[in-house]
Amino acid sequence: MRIAVIGGGPAGLYFAILMKRDFPSARVTVVERNRADDTFGFGVVFSDATLDTFQQADEPSYRAITRSFAYWDDIAIHLPARPGRDESGSVHRIGGNGFCGCSRRTLLLLLQERARGLGVELEFRREAAPEDFPDADLIVAADGINSPIRERWKAHFAPEVDLRPNRFAWMGSTRPFDAFTFFFKERPEGIFIAHCYQYEAGASTWVMETDPETFARAGLDGMGEAESARYLEDVFAEELAGHRLITNRSLWRRFPTIKCGRWVKDNVVLLGDAKATAHFSIGSGTKLAMEDAIGLHRAFLAGGSVATCLARYESGRREDVEKTQHAANVSLVWFEHVKRFWNFSATRFAFGVMTRSKAITWDNLELRAPEFVAETRRAFAEEARAAGLPADDAKPPMFQPFALRGMQLANRIVVSPMCMYSAEDGVPGDFHLAHYASRAVGGAGLIFTEMTCPAADARITPGCTGLWNDTQEAAWRRIVEFAHVHSEAKLCLQLGHAGRKGATKLMWDGIDQPLPEGGWPIISASPIPYFPHSQVPREMARADMDRVRDEFVAATLRAVRIGFDMLELHCAHGYLLASFLSPLTNIRTDEYGGTIANRLRYPLEVFRAMREVWPAGKPMSVRISATDWAEGGLSEEDCLAVARAFAEAGADLVDVSTGQTVADASPVYGRMYQLPWSDMIRNEAGIATMCVGNITTPDQVNTILAAGRADLVALARPHLTNPSFTLHAAAQYGVRDIACPPQYLWGKDALLRNAAREQADLKELRLKARPRSHAPEAQDLPRAAE
């Protein structure tokens, strides 16, 4: 086999090593445009888990690399003095992480040495293109982030480049470190961040980062390397401790997140940064590149033609790459919005740094650094106490109380509003009683009803619940009274109007599909059908607005009589009021269309009318779709304007959902995928939020709350299969005083006893499953700062 590798970085060299080792008869050539000892940047970082992977892939190169690594276990987070928050600044050292740093130049030289020893042909200071290797069976394009090969066949590889807004520059210093260190500094120009680690004796990396506004105010766009280094030496004078910054092509850049639709063209395959990048804030660029090499090598070990192996590589490797990129993207967004968290307590800020990428969570961090998690737990409880609530230092965040106006919740778990499509003529029946009652006694602090409609023609389907007559009112009262008598749960009525998404089939018969018969006329902000074959709604006239507003008010008065604890107005998911908010569904030219202020006009009118008749001591919330997941939809600025407007109108909480506005939306799903919008609204608009969306575990709930990204957490699907989700979570964390009906106490006691044993066993398994430490105690490796 003839293999040509274009690009002599870690990805290309490592692949050449693995292939020549296992296919010794193959002729493997690596061609690099730079000199053998040229490198840009300073150090690279690998975790213990990554080192495990390298050891399994190639023991000799692993041993050579680790002999040159500096190792550290802690992450240190330094915050400056912040007037009104931390007068003297703070430092958090959080252990249990296990990282190594190495000079990028040393890494390349060691990989070159290993490759030569195996018989790989290495050529430097040579530009190469695929046509230079007409007899090659395989051409590997490992030619970097600006890959000429990728750009040459751009139409085929279909790269997407997302140029992120923050500016960054790689610098170095002689200052030693014994931890991976984050320095956050505030100047009149703005906030600067330094990501620092030692990679060999007397050498450390300093990745400088700042937002575009601070970059411009500081004048860094007009400075050269030396001048910007001197400027940053002034910013980080205390942190540098007398050491100077070192430059090496330390140019200010914006990070390009690169994804490719295809990785393979004929016998050419993209590898490393040429096909996908991962942001430096999780230290995964070189890891991703070298693991690409391992994945491609394994594809060839499995046998078959070159085409078969390349297809196997792309299909088998893509998911792992996308997961790493997703974690990196979530992390980089946290740093882009660091101003959002600047007034957090030092403990909450540090917890946010640690959990920013979702790779580390509450339970995981408790294994790594139990003292820090205990501090976080105490700090969260103290915030609740400061709000006048009976908090308990021993409980995790999800079991701390929360209050909205005069309503106090026993915990922060919410049963999300979920349409059951099981009512007859809008009347909730026995199914609904069993559904809501079982979740109430299951321990959740707050239970939302499904979207309940204020009129018959406001329903999504014939099976939707309503609140427009006495029969419905009596049926809802039965449910609310049961919950109040037999549980500590509070109940929130969600009122909404389906608008253009009304008169459709039951979900299991065809979600959002129009009824073939028995439908009713529908209305919307504009006469735009949801699907091309959907019923065309009539554009609302002023008389329609008056009628619908009054129907909402009448339903609100019924909710008062029933005794609901809280009320929510549904302004999301493309339903009637949401259709006014989104520019995709509102093309009106009157005072209710156009600007966001105009688009808000009618939804706010309805909300204010409801708030006026709803008791002053009881809270109200609004559910919104914070993004439409479609081009031309609601912007972040619009979203914040919506949240602020409802807060000014008397909303106590924003229930943050996304999408379902238009049929051709392209949502990006994943764990906790709607959390960024809850975070943004809570910490920029300054209103309490409830997050929802693929949140499935108590661990995730605690992570979200402790990081200050939401105040309440709603779970839907987990409550469908486990009405006692909260009771089980209480047992998991040893919370004994969760409310439980006396009829169920024996079961609760057994659950608590069994959970204690199960959690001890689980902790032991998790500790055993952790990557083994590559610390120098076990090997002859240098410690960082030695």
Q: In which residue ranges do the predicted regions lie?
A:
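Glycine-rich FAD cofactor-binding loop and adjacent beta-loop-alpha segment at the N-terminus
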Residues: 1-4, 8-73, 95-106, 285
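Flavin-dependent oxidoreductase catalytic cores
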Residues: 374-786
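Residue-level marker for buried hydrophobic side chains located in beta-strands
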Residues: 29, 268-270, 447, 713
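Conserved mid-domain beta->alpha element of the FAD-binding
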Residues: 8-18, 140-141, 171, 251-330, ...
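Glycine-rich, N-terminal phosphate-binding loop of Rossmann-like dinucleotide-binding domains
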Residues: 142-144, 278-279, 418, 717
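Conserved FAD-binding catalytic core of PHBH/FMO-like flavoproteins
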Residues: 113, 135-255, 259-260
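Conserved N-terminal helical subregion
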Residues: 48-170, 372-382
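C-terminal helical "tail/cap" subdomain of flavin- and related membrane-associated enzymes
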Residues: 298-388
